[in-house]
From Swiss-Prot:
PROSITE patterns per UniProt: RIBOSOMAL_S15 (PS00362)
InterPro entries, per database record: Ribosomal_uS15, Ribosomal_uS15_arc_euk, Ribosomal_uS15_N, uS15_NS1_RNA-bd_sf
Stated name of the protein: Small ribosomal subunit protein uS15
Species this chain originates from: Thermococcus kodakarensis (strain ATCC BAA-918 / JCM 12380 / KOD1) (Pyrococcus kodakaraensis (strain KOD1))
Entry annotated with the keyword Repeat: no
Recorded superkingdom: Archaea
Similarity comment: Belongs to the universal ribosomal protein uS15 family.
Subunit note: Part of the 30S ribosomal subunit.
UniProt region (Disordered), positions on chain: 1-22
GO molecular function: small ribosomal subunit rRNA binding; structural constituent of ribosome
One Pfam assignment: Ribosomal_S15
Length: 151
């Protein structure tokens, strides 16, 4: 499989082993895992960090295997899901930081190209999220408004 904005092929990475049931050594029930996910979200952690913390500190290899639901689904059921999906928010944050850099260094052509690529990814993701209903149909990416979205 090729990269999005390059002509190179990607490097193969490690894959999670295919499983249908949780491992026997996991000591947590589905309700306990859901409570942990909600608690960590209320502490301000992102979904990616929640998964990492559960893996490293609690020994939970996969929330989906134990609960049957992904972390985002659990957060949606408890009303804690972010209004803008996390991957889109991270891309917007990168674009805002790069625009700030380009204000100070206007001749940085390589970074300008990087900004174009990041904003292309943002537009592609917005189109997908509008189609699936995770974003309103009228939602648009605006660089000036993005500064206000990013904390």
């Amino acid at each position: 499989m090729a990269r999005i904005h390059a002509r190179k092929r990607g490097k193969s990475g490690s894959k999670r082993p295919p499983r249908t049931a949780p491992p026997a050594w996991v000591e947590y029930t589905a309700e306990e895992v859901e409570a942990l996910v909600v608690k960590l979200r209320k502490e301000g952690y992102s979904t990616a960090m929640i998964g990492t913390i559960l893996r490293d500190q609690y020994g939970i290899p996969s929330v989906k295997l134990i609960t049957g639901k992904k972390i985002t689904k659990i957060l949606e059921e408890n009303g804690l899901a972010p209004e803008i999906p996390e991957d889109l928010m991270f891309l917007i944050r990168r674009a805002v930081n790069l625009r700030k850099h380009l204000e100070q260094h206007p001749k940085d052509k390589h970074s300008r190209r990087g900004l174009q690529l990041i904003e292309s990814k943002i537009r592609r993701l917005v189109k997908y999220y509008r189609r699936t209903g995770k974003l309103p149909a009228k939602w648009r990416y605006d660089p000036e408004q993005a500064k206000l979205l990013v904390r």
